[in-house]
From Swiss-Prot:
Coiled coil: none annotated. Heterotrimer of A, B and C subunits. It comes from Thermus thermophilus (strain ATCC BAA-163 / DSM 7039 / HB27). Its EC number is 6.3.5.-. Belongs to the GatB/GatE family. GatB subfamily. One of its GO terms (molecular function) is glutaminyl-tRNA synthase (glutamine-hydrolyzing) activity. It holds the Pfam family GatB_N. Keywords: ATP-binding, Ligase, Nucleotide-binding, Protein biosynthesis. One of its GO terms (biological process) is glutaminyl-tRNAGln biosynthesis via transamidation. PANTHER family: GLUTAMYL-TRNA GLN AMIDOTRANSFERASE SUBUNIT B MITOCHONDRIAL AND PROKARYOTIC PET112-RELATED (PTHR11659), GLUTAMYL-TRNA(GLN) AMIDOTRANSFERASE SUBUNIT B, MITOCHONDRIAL (PTHR11659:SF0). It comes from the Bacteria. It catalyses: L-glutamyl-tRNA(Gln) + L-glutamine + ATP + H2O = L-glutaminyl-tRNA(Gln) + L-glutamate + ADP + phosphate + H(+); L-aspartyl-tRNA(Asn) + L-glutamine + ATP + H2O = L-asparaginyl-tRNA(Asn) + L-glutamate + ADP + phosphate + 2 H(+). This is Aspartyl/glutamyl-tRNA(Asn/Gln) amidotransferase subunit B. Allows the formation of correctly charged Asn-tRNA(Asn) or Gln-tRNA(Gln) through the transamidation of misacylated Asp-tRNA(Asn) or Glu-tRNA(Gln) in organisms which lack either or both of asparaginyl-tRNA or glutaminyl-tRNA synthetases. The reaction takes place in the presence of glutamine and ATP through an activated phospho-Asp-tRNA(Asn) or phospho-Glu-tRNA(Gln).
Amino acid sequence: MYEAVIGLEVHLHLKTRTKMFCGCRADYFGAEPNTHTCPVCLGLPGALPVPNRVAVEHGLRLALALGAEVPERLVFHRKNYFYPDLPKNYQISQYDLPLGRGGSLPLGERRVRIKRLHLEEDAGKSLHLEGRTLLDLNRAGSPLIELVTEPDLKTPEEARLFLQRIQALVQTLGISDASPEEGKLRADVNVSVRRVGEPLGTKVEIKNLNSFKSVQRALEYEIRRQTEILRRGEKVKQATMGFEEGSGKTYPMRTKEEEADYRYFPEPDLPPVVIPRDWLEEVRRSLPELPWEKEARYRALGIKEKDAEVLAYTPSLARFLDQALPLGLASPQALANWLLADVAGLLHERGLRLEETRLSPEGLARLVGLFERGEVTSRVAKSLLPEVLEGQDPEALVRERGLKVVADEGALKALVAEAIAAMPEAAESVRQGKVKALDALVGQVMRKTRGQARPDLVRRLLLEALGVG
């Protein structure tokens, strides 16, 4: 019996106005190539770096949220290697005094341990065409935080979930958009396979995975590959692998470097960054409610466990729900149901995000409240949702169109009698115990009321009229 052991290295672009060590704008996505550069990020002689205070503070927020230990001073190091999109031939990173050590992230019933977090600058981007390579250095020098886990993950699904949780956390903290599509969240995975109970196997790294799906697919393939090697009695070779999206297979890129290969040494142009304790405490006090704290609060409000988890780890939905709940217009679980089913379905159908609509927390809460109080039927409420999504007032729509539930039993009994007279065969079937035939009669009455009667009330009145207990 074989098992996988997985660790992740997560690279997150920090949401700052300027780059990590210079004044170039950091919003390079979609810009003309090589327009967000300067002597510092191009590595020109004599250009000196200056640390970005906002980037350091963003890093502190993440470290504190994860419960990591933050040192009294940060030291930057040069990580030396040659690659065309690294104009200095070294990357300013951190080594033995990183931003944070330890901490953990909740994942189900257990916690995934964090080994370290460190700040660094990003490299540029290479575009490989036929017979040539183009370089775009807009990204070079952009602020990154790298988060390294302990090898606590066991399956590709867990790795994917961990990345989704980290994405939700940094979005909640407001320190990163963490959009894989824009390259603002990238992951390298380290995976080895061993027999259960045996020491760790040989580690293989898969580089530059830029979507959650890619991480899962790459791990699934690599675990199968290593397992087959071990079953043949052969040894897995330590290597760095790439992942080919089309084939779903990993492929060798180069042999795996060791730390010594990078020849780390302290960055001579940057003095240590001192982290005063009062600054650290100020950052700690500014932390928002974290997703796992939010999940616990939702569950305490009576929201189902799975619903609470999805809402808490989807920042846009959590923000919306947290504005709707204090209004007291609808129950927490009903709001959760509508957000996760009806609203989510309509957004998916239209290809929209929640923040791209005019749906307000109050508007949805009023619509759900109308349904919960029995003032409109489920059918009517759902039919109004597209207009409420456009910013319409649901209560005004109900008033203007006369959509309130028909609750007058006298009027309904007359419609029930008409339905029975119009559908004698269905009525006789119900009298003979074939209760499914009742649905046709209910439908007839509902059509007469334009869907404004409560189906349960119509059903009861029909059974009474047919003399069926």
